[in-house]
A protein has these predicted regions:
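Alpha-helical segment of the N-proximal tetratricopeptide repeat
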Residues: 442-475
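Divalent-metal (often Zn2+) His-rich catalytic cores of metallo-beta-lactamase-fold enzymes
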Residues: 23-37, 298, 308, 324-388, ...
Length: 655
């Protein structure tokens, strides 16, 4: 989950002069909350017992700061979650999940053998005792939170049992909240000097650095909404993501693995301790594994099995995941280790203890993902489209009894739509929907059809009054797209999103609705999660990926007549890229040296890293001689000017 796209996201200020406070929970919302509370065993104490089990220490106030005193993590603003009873403005099931995720500290999972640092990032860091030292699993998103978590462990455990070296670091999968903090616990120099093993799944290096580079701008913009980064914490604001509290806002780093586990899995001895690895690539992440430690009877389920139904397609955008394969990987875990594993722990949330409970967790999670897949195809093969699937489907039977399968992050609703997309694509098969006009063109016609803006607004307000918020959103969205300066319409649509957000069980859905409402009101706060990428992360981005990303920024409309070959030479990394421009397309040929380029540009890869991190700009580098241009300098400058920066603040809820 949870990646470096946040580094590209900027605060968003969509000005509106009519800033209103959020609405209170409506009667319809209060009734929906009460109905859900009645049918779920919200008073089941087992998860709360597991969440606090083995707690040894905590960071005071949950406050972590950076070198310059900037706040990286702060749980003080979330003290409202101390209340047991959910307010009317928060789904009671999500409130329960948020309170569980709010538990923070150092926890002993297997006495004297395994510990976890939880509640100081969206993810969890696990520390395992080897024969002579420590094995670290998933060192969080930010270097600052990882360092604080490691210090908490050292101050608590090592002061009692003695200081031991870090012998290995395990990256369970290719999302940055599971490796980005590695520089906070070990340096590259220490890895080389101490021969520290860094173990990751096959394909990790390519996926960890390349993912989201091409589409990072749009993903980052949507992520601000999904994670509630432009919302203040509180009962009417950001409460939780479902997967964890929120994203930390520190420095994201990277280290290259020293070894990878193949697709066939492997049995490894790490610091004298036996590990069994099972490949899980193509489930929650493209490169992923789970592992079992036989001497400790401990199963690490990574992000394949957590205490929620995960995303088949995340709201920020990604490639669709395979729910069928996901269910089969969980079944393989159940067959291989069910009945033997006495504790299951993951990269998020709290552990599950007891062989029977671990097997039950795996079985229920397997069933939940299989249900998403099979129910989608059952209905699709009877003619249902992605617009109809969710309304024709009741939740899986297990979801009413096992909180670990509930829609706290992913949902049955958009998981089925994603599965439909995986098999059938974006189109529902109806030719009326094959090439509809864009909203900016169709919306004014809907307004006219309704008899004018006042009548459409009245219809939307009537839908709000009746508690039909989905219909209200559809009506009022048309009006806002037709008349974005109509602040009565914006206010009514924001009120609609308030209620939809309050009712949402998914933390991601809640955040998205409430962020949309804040945008309509012009009430966003500066983004609370704005990670900086360290040089180690940027340097790991393959040069070929950088030039592919650059090509996506080429303005084909303005450059349709441009033709040429721009040869890049990177002396320090001994790389060459020939960029062929023709017919409105820019095609980088990595590793190719053109015989007769239009211009040759010599630039060190290290200098290119400075450009990517914002430490240097091309014009200044050309003036200083750090970039040397031979050949048609004017043609190069004309080509270079055809790469405008993407707007990280593009509109979502208005045209």
């Amino acid at each position: 989950m949870k990646k470096a796209w946040m580094a590209m996201a900027l605060p968003v200020l969509l000005a509106a002069p009519d800033v209103r406070a959020q609405d209170a929970a409506s009667a319809a919302t209060r009734a929906a909350q009460a109905e859900l509370a009645k049918r779920l065993p919200l008073d089941d104490p087992q998860d709360f017992k597991n969440a606090v089990r083995g707690k040894l220490a905590e960071i005071a106030g949950g406050l972590i700061t950076g070198k310059d005193g900037q706040i990286i993590w702060d749980r003080r603003a979330y003290a409202f979650l101390d209340a047991e009873e959910a307010p009317d403005t928060v789904n009671p099931s999500l409130w329960r999940q948020a309170r569980l995720n709010a538990v923070h500290g150092l926890f002993e999972v297997v006495p004297g053998k395994i510990w976890q640092v939880r509640g100081y990032d969206i993810s969890v860091m696990t520390i395992i005792r080897g024969k002579s030292g420590w094995i670290i699993v998933d060192p969080l998103l930010s270097e600052e939170t990882a360092a604080a978590g490691w210090k908490l462990f050292a101050d608590t455990v090592e002061t009692q049992s003695g200081k031991r070296p870090i012998k290995a670091v395990i990256f369970s999968h290719s999302h940055s909240d599971h490796f980005g903090g590695v520089g906070g616990i070990v340096s590259k120099e220490e890895v080389a000097r101490e021969k520290i093993r860094i173990i990751a799944p096959h394909g990790f290096s390519e996926e960890a650095t390349a993912e989201n580079v091409l589409a990072g701008g749009a993903m980052g913009r949507r992520a601000l909404y999904m994670f509630g980064a432009i919302l203040a914490p509180g009962p009417t604001g950001q409460v939780d993501t479902g997967l964890g509290p929120k994203l930390s806002s520190g420095t994201i780093g990277y280290m290259e693995p020293t070894e990878t586990v193949p697709a066939t899995g492997a049995s490894l001895t790490i610091d004298g301790l036996a590990f069994e690895f099972l490949d899980a690539g193509g489930t929650e992440a493209p490169a992923e594994f789970v592992f079992y430690i036989p001497p400790y009877k401990a199963l690490h389920t990574t992000e394949v099995v957590t205490h929620n139904l995960h995303n088949i397609l995340t709201l920020r955008g990604a490639q669709v995941r395979d729910a069928l394969h996901w269910s089969k990987v969980i079944d393989a875990m159940l067959l291989k280790w069910g009945g033997s594993a006495e504790v299951a722990m993951a990269s998020h949330h709290w552990p599950t203890w007891g062989a029977g409970e671990v097997s039950r967790l795996l079985s229920n999670q397997r069933g939940a993902y299989r249900y998403v897949h099979d129910r989608t195809l059952f209905l699709a093969n009877q003619g249902a489209t992605l617009h109809e699937l969710a309304d024709q489907t009741a939740e899986a039977p297990v979801q009413g009894a096992d909180f670990s399968t509930r829609s706290y992050y992913g949902t049955l609703n958009h998981g089925m739509k994603a599965t439909y997309q995986r098999y059938f694509g974006w189109w529902d098969g109806n030719p009326a929907n094959f090439n509809p006009p864009p909203p900016e063109q169709s919306a004014p016609k809907y307004v006219a059809l309704a008899g004018g803006a006042d009548k459409l607004l009245a219809a939307g307000e009537a839908a709000i009054a009746s508690g039909d918020y989905r219909w209200a959103a559809e009506l009022l969205n048309k009006l806002v797209f037709a008349e974005p300066a109509n602040f009565a319409a914006r206010s009514a649509l924001a009120s609609t999103y308030d209620q939809l957000g309050y009712q949402a069980e998914s933390g991601a859905w809640r955040n998205y609705y409430l962020a949309a409402a804040a945008s309509l009101r012009g009430a966003e706060i500066p983004a609370s999660a704005s990670n900086g990428q360290s040089r180690s992360f940027v340097s790991a981005i393959p040069t070929s990926v950088f030039f592919d990303a650059l090509a996506t920024r080429f303005d084909a409309a303005s450059g349709s007549g441009l033709k040429g070959v721009f040869q890049f030479v990177l002396p320090d990394s001994k790389e060459a890229v020939a960029v062929v421009v023709e017919g409105g397309v820019e095609f980088p040929r990595y590793g190719v040296t053109d015989a007769a380029p239009t211009a040759t540009i010599t630039i060190d890869r290290r200098t290119l890293d400075d450009v990517m991190t914002g430490l240097a700009q091309f014009p200044a580098l050309m003036q200083s001689g750090a970039i040397r241009i031979e050949g048609d300098r004017t043609a190069f400058l004309s080509w270079f000017a055809l790469h405008p920066r993407a707007d990280p603040r593009f509109n979502i809820v208005v045209p």
